[in-house]
Regions:
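Glycine-rich beta-strand-centered segment in the early N-terminal region that forms part
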Residues: 25-41, 49, 53-100
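Conserved hydrophobic beta-strands of the Rossmann-like cofactor-binding core
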Residues: 94, 150-153, 219-220
Length: 230
């Protein structure tokens, strides 16, 4: 029997979150219906800027625009596919991305071009990181790093941690900056070369010591804010 409704996490117009039930969109010829096993909370979007938005909504509710489903990265098993889908099949493990599609939901309808097969060795939990991992990978590619260079990652949230790990795998020496010492310690456990908790130390001096005075070859800004808005 076809599934017609699902449950999804949504922002409400009162500055909060709620689990709501809504109709699933019809399955188009290029769509994939996924039974979601894991979805990833993006701290910068949903807990950073997201909480600011929640406060605005609490102070100025807009009932006609709420509730608003959230989430953009999940993983699960394909339940059904549209007539023209060729990349994945029913029963296959997949990861999905895309705001408005790969939501925090029980089921999700996602366009085929936003769905990728998951290797057997990759867990659903790891697969749900696909969107943020792709963001980090794009940042590393844009730096055009070379072996032996010095890199800095400014901000050690999820994207920053993933970026630092990928830079290390690319053969660079990496220092990470963050306001929170706990994030620096996490990066150190992940194998980063050096960190600086900028609330306790001067990051410029720390970076000069790290590079032996040579300076940085590249840097990735992995923090939310107007300076990083495209």
């Amino acid at each position: 029997m076809p599934i017609e409704r699902t449950k999804v996490v949504a922002r409400t117009g009162r500055g909060g979150l709620s689990l709501i039930e809504e109709a699933l969109p019809p399955l188009g010829p290029h769509d994939v219906l996924i039974d979601v096993h894991r979805s990833l909370v993006s701290p910068g979007t949903e807990l950073g800027g997201g909480w600011a938005a929640l406060r605005r909504e609490r102070d100025d509710p807009k009932p006609l625009e709420m509730p608003r489903p959230i989430g953009y990265s999940n993983a699960g098993v394909v339940r059904s596919v549209g007539a023209d889908v060729s990349k994945v099949s029913v029963g296959q493990r997949v990861a999905a991305v895309g705001a408005g599609y790969a939501r925090h939901a029980v089921e999700a309808v996602v366009p085929e071009n936003l769905v990728i097969p998951l290797p057997d060795a990759v867990t659903f939990e790891a697969g749900s990181f696909a969107m943020l991992a792709a963001t980090a990978l794009h940042a590393v590619r844009r730096t055009r790093v070379s072996l032996g260079e010095y890199s800095a990652v400014l901000g050690l949230g999820l994207v920053g941690q993933l970026t630092a790990a990928l830079l290390r795998l690319s053969g660079t020496y990496v220092i990470g900056w963050d306001l929170l010492a706990t994030r620096c310690r996490t990066a150190e456990r992940m194998g980063i070369d050096a960190t600086c908790a900028v609330s306790d130390a001067d990051p410029v001096e720390a970076t000069e010591r790290f590079t032996g005075g040579a300076g940085l070859d590249n840097a990735v800004v992995a923090i939310a804010g107007e300076a990083t808005s495209a």
